[in-house]
Amino acid sequence: MEPELDLTLKLGLPNSTVETHLTLSPPTTTTDQGTNVVDGGEVINHRRGLLGDDEVIHNEPTRNNVEFNIRIYNYVFQQFVGAPNTLNFAPYPMPPSPAPAPETPPVSDEYVLIDVPARRARRNNSTVMTNSWKENATPKRIRGCGGFCGGRIEGMKKCTNMNCNALNTPMWRRGPLGPKSLCNACGIKFRKEEERKAKRNVVIVLDD
């Protein structure tokens, strides 16, 4: 009991402070770590005064705990105390917001969008890939059709419906881009949709 009393008197610290801050075990809780961060320099000096430099250097658990506190203390010191103009903190500038991308207008003079069954769309897209023009393109396909005949793939006719892309069809039909711009299926669907719109417009006029 007497050595403990002498130790407390030499350090000038109450017993509670010695027991709280001079533990030899690594910090295990957030509260302990926070205490060691704030009083990092004092804790290290108290341990060296209590244990001696030899114990701090050669005792592995003690050395690890001291090194841990040194790293934490140095980090806090460099971030706050050692920073120039410590009292004049300026908010970190936020990066400027990127300029909004310009809206891409629909290329209405090159293609249209009409819903088609997914199975037919996959089949037609596969056909487009396998029939893309290379060295073996036949003169007939290169010539294509006379006049305006919808989309083309290097001279080959193609349905202008971007969801369809049909290359082969019993006949080409009129679409939003003109005559023979849609395949047979898309042309029929487009015509029926136009008829439904016309009927709805008639009903609206009669109601008014």
UniProtKB/Swiss-Prot annotation:
Zinc finger (GATA-type): 155-208
Localization terms from the record: Nucleus
Source organism: Arabidopsis thaliana (Mouse-ear cress)
Name of the featured protein: GATA transcription factor 29
Record function comment: Transcriptional regulator that specifically binds 5'-GATA-3' or 5'-GAT-3' motifs within gene promoters.
Keywords: DNA-binding, Metal-binding, Nucleus, Transcription, Transcription regulation, Zinc, Zinc-finger
Database matches in InterPro entries: Znf_GATA, Znf_NHR/GATA
Family: Belongs to the type IV zinc-finger family. Class B subfamily.
GO biological process: regulation of DNA-templated transcription
GO CC annotation terms, alphabetical: nucleus
GO MF assignments: sequence-specific DNA binding; zinc ion binding
